[in-house]
């Protein structure tokens, strides 16, 4: 069976919740250690190459900008207070839609679902988010089935989300 490395791009932005991007980063990185294969190439992507200040002052520098980002097999949109600003930026929404279109899998963590909703990627699909944002998600994505009793939602292979 042929093996290839999957590119995992994690979008980071100011006021991103550290746990929401660092957790997936660690999980995908450790999966490579467990298999002794180059299964995943995990990297951070932002609008620009500038340092990102996550929640509570934690700083990171993205490896790629939107313009230089390689093709993604997996796109991860983390949450945090910064999603409220990012969901209004057309460049962000356009980039998310473009990368999601060619990705094998798209997922969000917590309030990252807000960005997917504003991108139109949750239309007609199931989703969940932080308990305090459930009603807002229902308002911003009226055709989305918002679950308040689930920690995750899998929309199947064709759903990508």
Question: How would you label these PLM feature ranges?
Answer:
Residues 1-106, 114-118, 135, 144-149, ...:
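Extended, subdomain-level signal for the structured scaffold at the beginning of enzyme domains
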Residues 121-139:
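Short, glycine-/small-residue-rich phosphate/pyrophosphate-handling segment
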């Amino acid at each position: 069976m042929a093996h290839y490395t999957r590119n995992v791009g994690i979008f980071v932005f100011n006021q991103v919740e550290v746990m929401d991007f660092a957790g997936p980063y660690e999980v995908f990185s450790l999966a490579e250690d467990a298999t002794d294969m180059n299964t995943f190439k995990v990297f951070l992507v932002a609008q620009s190459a500038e340092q990102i200040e996550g929640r509570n002052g934690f700083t990171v520098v993205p490896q790629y900008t939107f313009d230089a980002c390689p093709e993604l097999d997996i796109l991860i949109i983390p949450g945090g207070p910064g999603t409220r600003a990012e969901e209004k930026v057309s460049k962000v929404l356009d980039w998310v839609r473009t990368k999601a279109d060619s990705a094998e899998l798209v997922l969000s963590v917590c309030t990252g679902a807000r960005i997917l909703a504003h991108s139109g990627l949750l239309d007609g699909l199931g989703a969940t988010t932080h308990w305090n944002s459930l009603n807002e998600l229902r308002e911003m994505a009226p055709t989305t089935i918002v679950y308040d009793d689930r920690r995750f939602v899998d929309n199947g292979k064709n759903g990508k989300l």
